[in-house]
UniProtKB/Swiss-Prot annotation:
Encoding gene per record: TAF7
Subcellular compartments: Nucleus
This protein's name: Transcription initiation factor TFIID subunit 7
Organism for this UniProt entry: Saccharomyces cerevisiae (strain ATCC 204508 / S288c) (Baker's yeast)
InterPro entries assigned to the protein according to its UniProt record, in alphabetical order: TAF7, TAFII55_prot_cons_reg
UniProt main location, coarse: nucleus
Annotated region described as Disordered, given as residue ranges: 1-65, 325-453, 489-579
SMART domains linked to this entry: TAFII55_N
Length: 590
């Protein structure tokens, strides 16, 4: 450390004390401290400005300055300074960017965190938690850990007792920034399960999580007491710190609880710990099985004789026959059985073979019955087809005969009327087809509109429950699209209904016009028919008059003939006279 001292030179008669009336001068020292201790000490520089005393000769020497320079190195060894440990600070990460192994500013040890899931009760505080997630304000939510497994969750000044349980699966939590790539953030293997509201924090130790079990006690029920004692010992020495008063009070309850959750976080993983994951074999159990196998092998070696039989299918059938005959046989009293008794193993093998063969025979019989039923059905269908064919032939023959009769009875005269009827029927059928098409199109549009409205309501319901902003934006976009499609379908349906109404009105007008024309035609036809009837009546009257004239003439002729026959023979008339009389209608003399 360098020190500089500056002194003002005084005369020979001056004293060190200051004069009267003058202020006392302060001694000025300038010190410079070097904070960096790694710099080596530099040589000192000393300047003395005091005036020298007079020499013995009485001669006064000139004022001179004495300068001393110490350029020698400090011989003391420099002590080794211990450097402070370096703190490695991670760079500030831009929100939305995650770890990239191919980036230029790659991290040496990227951080992968572990997290827990908080599952709360579906009560009135659920909406408060959703609003906190949406707004990002978590001031009303706090978690206070009581020990490694118990915590007190406070939501909007309401305390809940919670227990940390182990999930049967490890869940990877991912996020997406561009809606295409997934980026892993952390793993989840535990869940903080809220049980019920509590009034005091001490109540959390008395809670038990539902659907939990202790896997160690479950698989080793014979040594439960020893397991519980070991757990209590572990809890007492947790982290080398003494237990709190509440933990010591509820030590046994904490140790006897189960913290292994049976289910996953989704419905398909219900009771997945027992349904899907089998327990692992303990090494002691493997040793026990090996010892038992060795014992059986030793007993097999120590046996005097070992025999085994290879059973063939034909032999099984023979044994089956013998078994069936043996069951049907009844032993008579006093007569010993000549057949030796079968062993249990043989009976078991024979019974299994009998069951298999019986099943095969039943299957064959079932196939035969099905084939017979198919044949019967085929024959029935053929008979029905033949009957229908015969009936069709008869109907066809009757129609042909009817056509011939129509031709013979003057069917040609009504050809024009038939053509008109056919044309009218064709027009009616075309109009009916158009009506059916319009009706089907209208029904199709109505069904599509109903489906869109149902989907729209379902999407709105999802939007009301969604908490993620990305999902909300997607639901909003889909709702806008569905509303546009529904509006378009409504317009199409309205246009279709209007067009159908116009067509119906046009058809009604056309039908009224056609009815008027038909009525006029019918009136004209009726007038023509009346004229024809009048002409026919006139002709009939003329014919009747002619017939009456002929009848009268014939009657007159008969009368004349009778009179001639009755007249006396003396007056004879020749043929010319008779003709003249007939011609002029003359009558004979009386």
């Amino acid at each position: 450390m360098a020190v500089i001292r500056i002194k003002k030179p005084r005369g020979p008669g001056e004293k060190d004390q200051p004069l009267e009336g003058e202020p006392k001068l302060k001694r000025i020292r300038i010190k410079t401290k070097v904070t960096d201790e790694d710099i080596k000490p530099k040589p000192k520089l000393k300047i003395n400005l005091k005036k020298k005393k007079e020499s013995a000769d009485g001669k006064e020497k000139k004022n001179s300055l004495k300068l001393k320079l110490n350029l020698k190195k400090n011989e003391e060894p420099v002590k080794k300074i211990h450097k402070a440990p370096k703190l490695r600070l991670k760079p500030i990460r831009i929100p939305g960017e995650a770890y990239d192994s191919e980036a230029s500013d790659i991290e040496d040890d990227p951080l992968i965190e572990s997290g827990v899931i908080l599952r709360i009760l579906p009560d009135i505080q659920l909406e408060f938690v959703k609003n906190s997630l949406e707004s990002g304000d978590y001031s009303g939510i706090s978690i206070k850990w009581k020990n490694e497994r118990h915590a007190v969750v406070t939501i909007n000044d309401v305390m809940y007792g919670a227990i940390l349980v182990d999930l049967p699966t490890v869940i990877e939590v991912n996020k997406s920034v561009d809606r295409k790539n997934l980026l892993k953030t952390f793993d989840v293997s535990q869940m903080l399960l809220c049980i019920r509201p509590i009034q005091e924090e001490e109540e959390v130790y008395a809670l038990e999580a539902p659907d939990t079990e202790d896997l160690v006690v479950k698989h080793f029920e014979g040594i439960e007491d020893e397991i519980w004692e070991n757990k209590e010992t572990f809890l007492k020495g947790y982290n080398g710190a003494p237990l709190s008063d509440m933990e010591a009070k509820h030590l046994k309850e904490i140790a006897l609880k189960g913290y292994d959750y049976k289910h996953g976080i989704s419905p398909p993983l219900y009771n997945v710990r027992n349904r899907r994951f089998r327990r692992k074999m303990d090494p002691n159990e493997i040793d026990y099985v090996e010892k038992v196998v060795d014992m059986l092998l030793k007993q097999d070696k120590q046996a005097e004789e070992v025999s085994y039989d290879l059973v063939d299918k034909s032999e099984l059938q023979a044994r089956q026959e013998r078994v069936s005959s043996w069951e049907n046989f009844k032993e008579e009293p006093g007569e010993p059985l000549s057949r030796p008794a079968l062993k249990k193993e043989e009976i078991h093998t024979i019974a299994s073979a009998v069951g298999k063969q019986g099943a095969e025979e039943e299957g064959e019989e079932g196939m035969e019955e099905e084939e017979e039923e198919d044949l019967d059905l085929g024959a029935a269908f053929e008979s029905e087809e033949e009957g229908s064919g015969a009936e069709g032939d008869k109907e066809q023959q009757q129609e042909e005969v009817g056509d011939e009769v129509d031709q013979d009875t003057g069917g040609e005269d009504d050809d024009d009327d038939d053509d008109g009827d056919i044309e009218a029927a064709g027009g009616e059928s075309e109009s009916d087809d158009e009506k059916d098409e319009n009706r089907q199109h209208t029904e199709l549009l109505a069904d599509e509109l109903n489906e869109l409205e149902t989907t729209l309501a379902h999407t709105k319901h999802k939007l009301s429950k969604a908490t993620n902003p990305l999902l909300k934006s997607r639901f909003i976009d889909s709702i806008k699209k569905l509303e546009k499609e529904a509006e378009l379908k409504r317009k199409q349906l309205q246009q279709t209904e209007d067009s159908v109404q116009k067509q119906h009105q046009h058809r009604s007008d056309a039908e009224t016009a056609n009815n008027v024309e038909e009525e006029e035609e019918e009136e004209e036809e009726e007038e023509e028919e009346d004229e024809v009837d009048e002409d026919e009546e006139d002709d009939e009257e003329n014919d009747e008059d002619e017939d009456n004239v002929h009848e009268r003439e014939h009657i007159q002729e008969n009368k004349v003939v009778r009179e001639l026959d009755e007249a006396p023979a003396e007056e004879t008339l020749d043929q010319n006279d008779l003709d003249m009389m007939m011609l002029f209608g003359a009558e004979g003399d009386e």
